[in-house]
């Protein structure tokens, strides 16, 4: 496959994933995740003075929650869910590119491209790319 065709394929894959991230809608726990991010950001900015207990704080990355909350606050409130999906998509695509580069270093260029395509088209991973912020960051 020529580099022009590869770039075109990559462009359409990225556009398709952005389209899916924007049209997927709100999941049942996204408001809770934003609230966790708000509480964690208050904790970090107060240097530990505001310490509210958050369920599962020790199991998942509270830094990611606060970063996600901070970035979604940049956008208007009616677009916070879509902004969160784009942020999750960015980290998920980073995982895909990272695993592709890692397998390219371990094996060869063909295996790296194959791993990239398999992971991108794997339905469970692709379905969770935009809405699941817990598992994708652990894969990173």
Feature annotation, model-predicted:
Residues 33, 39, 92, 138-139:
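Hydrophobic core segments of transmembrane alpha-helices in multi-pass, intramembrane catalytic enzymes
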Residues 5-30, 38:
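Transmembrane signal-anchor helices characteristic of membrane glycosylation enzymes that use polyprenol
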Residues 22-28, 46-69:
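Membrane-proximal lumenal/periplasmic loop motifs of glycosylation machinery
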Residues 4-9, 78, 99-121:
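Transmembrane-helix signature of polytopic, membrane-embedded enzymes
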Residues 58, 62, 66, 76-94, ...:
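Loop-to-helix entry region of an early transmembrane alpha helix in multi-pass inner-membrane enzymes
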Residues 68, 72, 96-104, 123-126:
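Hydrophobic transmembrane alpha-helices
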Residues 9-14, 87-90, 111-125, 136-140:
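Membrane-embedded helix bundles of polyisoprenyl
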Residues 11, 83-106:
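Transmembrane-helix motifs of polytopic, lipid-linked glycan transferases
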């Amino acid at each position: 496959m020529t580099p022009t065709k590869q770039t075109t394929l990559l462009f359409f894959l990225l556009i398709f994933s952005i389209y899916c991230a924007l049209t997927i809608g709100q999941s049942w726990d996204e408001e809770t995740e934003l609230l966790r991010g708000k509480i964690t950001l208050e904790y970090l900015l107060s240097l530990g003075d505001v310490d509210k207990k958050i369920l599962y704080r020790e199991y998942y990355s509270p830094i990611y929650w606060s970063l996600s909350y901070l970035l979604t606050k940049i956008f208007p409130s009616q677009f916070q869910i879509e902004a969160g999906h784009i942020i999750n998509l960015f980290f998920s695509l980073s995982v895909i590119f990272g695993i592709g580069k890692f397998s390219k270093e371990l094996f060869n260029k063909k295996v790296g491209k194959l791993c990239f395509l398999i992971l991108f088209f794997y339905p469970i991973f692709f379905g969770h790319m935009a809405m699941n912020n817990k598992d994708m960051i652990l894969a990173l």
